[in-house]
Amino acid sequence: MGQSNLGSVIEDHALERVPDGERENWLVISWNTVGLITTLVILFFGALVCFVAGVRIALLAGLLSFAVGSGLAFGLARIAVETGHSNTLITRKYGLGTRGSALASVIFGFLIVGFLAVENALLYRGFLFFFDLADNWSSRLLVYGSMTIAWIALTAWGFGVVTRTSSVMTVGFFAVLAWMVGHMLLVGGGEGELLFARRLDAGTLSAMGITSNVDKFVFAFNLLVGPACALALNTADFGRYGKSTGHVTAAAMIAIGMQSLVIMLIGGILMQAAAPTMVEWLAATRGIPSEEAGRQLLQSPDSIAATFILFGGVAGFALMILAQAKAQVLNNYSSSLCIANLFDALFRWRPGRLAFVVLANVIALAMLYGKILHFVEDWSKLLGVL
């Protein structure tokens, strides 16, 4: 009996309906949805749209992103509650059929496993920066190996452990983030920075094809709505445990609002306050002119991790861990459900969800080795447009 219960916990109803007796309220589900979007990548997207469009235009784009994502989330919430299935399994049983569901699993799986890979890379470079490690195979095996084991161990035990992990880390994230925001605004410029206009010069914007306020709005919306809609799809993976459509919709809307407005704004404000110091640091450490350092500041989410560590030291490093670790557990969880549906739909192969937890991490590591992570951001924006 004990082995049967353990197997059931690990399998976590991956390819079946979640029983009514295991359903949870909006708060429990919110720990997972909010945990997914409180990450360095979302903070980076926020900084990018604020620097390109300015805070006011970015907020308008965020409002539209919130509306679109919430509408999609409401529809998926209702379906998830009534069916009790994950998002890709829903497409197989109630929409696209077996082949269509397999295609949906490939599309969604590339995005979610891609984020698993991207955020692994962010954590890796954060470890290198904080501990002053060399980027060699020893460091890669140690850091990537340790992280992969941690994600598998925390994801293997199903919804309950995933939710508890996310709740603890989300509370810690917001506590440390509040301290960091106050500290960086105090050091970097204070309240005068809150509603800044675009920071990039006209020449840089023109090279990006952005020549008007409409272009700025479109750029900001495309970058924000992709993660918002991806989060709406994730709603089914966690919402299948919801007690009602209202509970699941509330959990999704809280998270999408945080992603499209709050975390976006915080990312912009933090990087605006930190920009002068970061430009000086980049120019000094890389031996490049200040103008070039300013352009490099927003070329990669690495800048967010470096900013936190430079300004916050141990607290900044802790914030990076809290932001990324919970998201990795949640990404791994959704990835395992998606891949389980893919293999069941195509090959009728059901080795158990744990096998797909491991496979998702293997694919993420392969993405890192293949250096294809730049496709993930483009894919996110493309999904937003579609």
Model-derived regions: residue spans:
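Juxtamembrane transmembrane-helix boundary signature
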Residues: 63-96, 105-111, 117-120
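Hydrophobic, small-residue-rich membrane helices and short re-entrant helix-turn-helix hairpins
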Residues: 18-26, 157-170, 230-265, 280-289, ...
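Hydrophobic alpha-helical segments and their helix-loop junctions in multi-pass secondary transporters
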Residues: 172-206, 220, 227, 267-276
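Membrane-interface loop-to-helix entry segments
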Residues: 124, 142, 146-190, 196, ...
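Hydrophobic transmembrane alpha-helices that form the core helical bundles
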Residues: 101-135, 321-341
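Membrane-interface "cap" regions at the ends of multi-pass membrane proteins
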Residues: 1-59, 177-180, 187, 207-221, ...
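Loop-to-transmembrane helix boundary motifs in multi-pass membrane proteins
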Residues: 139-146, 341-373
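Transmembrane helix-loop junctions in multi-pass membrane proteins
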Residues: 41-56, 79-80, 118-127, 152-161, ...
